[in-house]
Amino acid sequence: MARLVVDGEDVVLRLTLPERVLARRREVRLPLTAVREVTVEPDWWRGLRGLPRSARWLPDRFCLGEWRHPEGRDFVAVREHGPVVVVDLRPSAPFDRLAVSTPDPEGVVRAIRQVA
């Protein structure tokens, strides 16, 4: 399962080895100044918007990679059944949103809010 952590002045989405292979990237690193809002969505599918662009997904199982929508693009690492951390980003960031399934979503939100 992907991990969303604060590393110094950055928010980092670290992917597991299988996720790295599917997403074709090791991590997504963004400055904390790019974070506009961070919340927990109780249903995993609520973090998704738009359509997959360079993404892998299995319906009702997982979604991983870049999703396009009319306002821009999001990076998602979402697994079925469970809450997701949704990080909405400022226009200067390469993505508009990160949506991530994590083992402790409330803890991740607290950690980001403390430093952002």
Where are these regions (language model features)?
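Conserved beta-hairpin
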Residues: 1-32, 36-39
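Acidic, Ser/Thr- and proline-rich intrinsically disordered linker/docking segments
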Residues: 23-32, 36-116
